[in-house]
């Protein structure tokens, strides 16, 4: 995405890369080279569509998926495919850390519990199960930082993304010596820490040639997809909250201090804004639930429209509440609020009366119910929720927007910029280039609300009743999947 000095999108491009491989249940791997290859195709297209010259680019920003473990050898070669964010094979390593350090001490040290999704547990798994690969590991990076390393030669990471490694002292914004020593990780293998708008490198010869950018163009640290997406949606001060549905689903709130949920059911990370933090809940398989249905059962007759548009149009034929049909979106285990990698998805209440439309709508409602679990925890923690902004695929669909307003029982807003993480990364680059003095100033100047959706009073009651039933499903099925 190319942004001008007024915050307008001058041009953008996307390029697909190979989806993750899942050779066993709970595994998820990608090849880092695929990310770089896609970047090398997308960036020149975006520059061409923006009709700008390489010398017109003042600064480059970054965002990308969090938690993934990219391991390089001494010469910079990828040791093995990256274990990405939704890989949950590492539950034994999570338990090992918890037993060794103690659950309370873990949260005190990192503001988070040890979860299978976090980077450290993935490193521990490789060390235990692939010792020959582990012997080769010299450098450890996260996904977006691998791409930046390819174009700058600098090993760097921002505070927000580093928060999801389980190696950062989140409260003090530095690597945790306690965690490094407990896990046996050499700090010298980790990237240097930067605040998100800070310049951490410049485009090198490889990057200039591959991307069509000017040699020496400054590059900022950027942020993981959630913090960057929040910046792109203006979620930078307490009270404004986002609910974003991508492959995963996230409810995100900015805070002026580290806000801890005692049970570790919410993540507390550094924000992309210096001196600020955020608290968020995560649904593992939000948009992934709808993609799973599409891949397994199809999107209906191909009439030239986007398959997801066809699916949501079909879902609109079913009534709100789906006549009692419920979907729990636990296809990849679940984080918030269960912290259970063994949780499994379920359709509950299926009858001969139900149709494909009911099932699709139940998936849309079930994902919204899962996100509502985070709002319930926010309420318990006294985290202010004055405005809710929607992002991702859940903001593009008129039906899913309305379902979320009805499930949350709250007016929701949709901002103009649809690609929140890319837009946020560009804003961070603008701050790094000096276009704006701060992230707050930039968001106030360029983030604009395009529309609002109000809850339907007659439907809110139906959703409240179904949500109460939804909350009972996990407890009723947990023992079935525990083994």
Give the ranges of each region predicted by the language model.
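N-terminal glycine/serine-rich phosphate-binding loop of ATP-dependent small-molecule kinases
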Residues: 1-80, 108, 136, 208-209, ...
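A generic structural motif
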Residues: 15-16, 85, 284
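Active-site donor-binding loop signature of nucleotide-sugar glycosyltransferases
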Residues: 15-17, 195, 271, 455
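Active-site core segments that coordinate phosphate-bearing ligands/cofactors
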Residues: 32, 91, 98-115, 120-157, ...
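Short beta-strand-loop/turn "lid" adjacent to the catalytic site in phosphate-handling enzymes
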Residues: 48-85, 113-119, 148-169, 192-196, ...
């Amino acid at each position: 995405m190319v942004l001008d000095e007024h915050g307008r999108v001058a041009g953008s491009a996307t390029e697909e890369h190979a989806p993750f491989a899942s050779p066993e249940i709970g595994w998820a791997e990608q090849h880092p080279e695929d990310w770089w290859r896609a970047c090398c195709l997308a960036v020149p297209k975006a520059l061409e569509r923006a009709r700008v010259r390489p010398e017109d680019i003042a600064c480059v920003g970054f965002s990308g998926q969090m938690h993934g473990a990219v391991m390089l050898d001494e010469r910079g070669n990828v040791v093995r495919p990256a274990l990405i964010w939704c890989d949950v094979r590492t539950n034994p390593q999570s338990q090992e850390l918890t037993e060794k350090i103690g659950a309370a001490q873990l949260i005190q040290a990192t503001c988070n519990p040890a979860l299978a999704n976090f980077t450290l547990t993935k490193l521990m798994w490789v060390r235990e199960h692939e010792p020959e690969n582990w012997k080769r590991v010299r450098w450890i990076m996260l996904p977006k930082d691998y791409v930046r390393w390819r174009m700058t030669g600098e090993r760097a990471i921002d505070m927000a993304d580093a928060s999801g490694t389980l190696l950062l002292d989140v409260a003090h914004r530095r690597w945790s010596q306690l965690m490094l020593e407990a896990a046996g990780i050499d700090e010298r293998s980790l990237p240097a820490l930067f605040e998100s708008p800070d310049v951490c490198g410049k485009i090198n010869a490889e990057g200039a040639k591959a991307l069509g950018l000017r040699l020496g163009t400054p590059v900022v640290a950027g942020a993981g997809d959630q913090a960057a997406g929040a910046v792109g949606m203006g979620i930078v001060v307490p009270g404004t909250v986002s609910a974003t549905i991508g492959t995963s689903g996230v409810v995100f709130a900015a805070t002026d201090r580290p806000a801890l949920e005692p049970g570790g059911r919410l993540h507390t990370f550094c924000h992309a804004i210096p001196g600020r933090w955020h608290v968020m809940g995560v649904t593992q398989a939000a948009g992934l639930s709808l993609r799973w249905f599409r891949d397994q059962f199809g999107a209906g007759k191909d009439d030239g429209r986007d398959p997801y548009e066809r699916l949501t149009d079909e879902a609109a034929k079913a009534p709100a509440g789906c006549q009692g049909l419920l979907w729990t979106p636990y296809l990849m285990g679940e984080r918030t609020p269960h912290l259970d990698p063994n949780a499994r998805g379920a359709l509950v209440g299926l009858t001969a009366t139900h149709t494909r439309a009911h099932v699709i709508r139940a998936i849309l409602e079930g994902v919204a119910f899962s996100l509502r679990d985070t709002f319930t925890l926010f309420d318990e923690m006294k985290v202010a929720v004055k405005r809710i902004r929607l992002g991702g695929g859940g903001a593009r669909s008129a039906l899913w927007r309305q379902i979320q307003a009805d499930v949350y029982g709250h007016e929701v807003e949709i901002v103009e910029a649809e690609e929140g993480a890319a837009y946020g990364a560009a804003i961070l680059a603008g701050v790094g280039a000096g276009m704006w003095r701060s992230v707050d100033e930039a968001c106030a100047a360029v983030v604009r609300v395009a529309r609002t959706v109000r809850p339907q009073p007659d439907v809110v009651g139906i959703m409240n009743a179904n949500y109460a039933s939804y909350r009972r499903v996990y407890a009723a099925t947990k023992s079935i999947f525990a083994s």
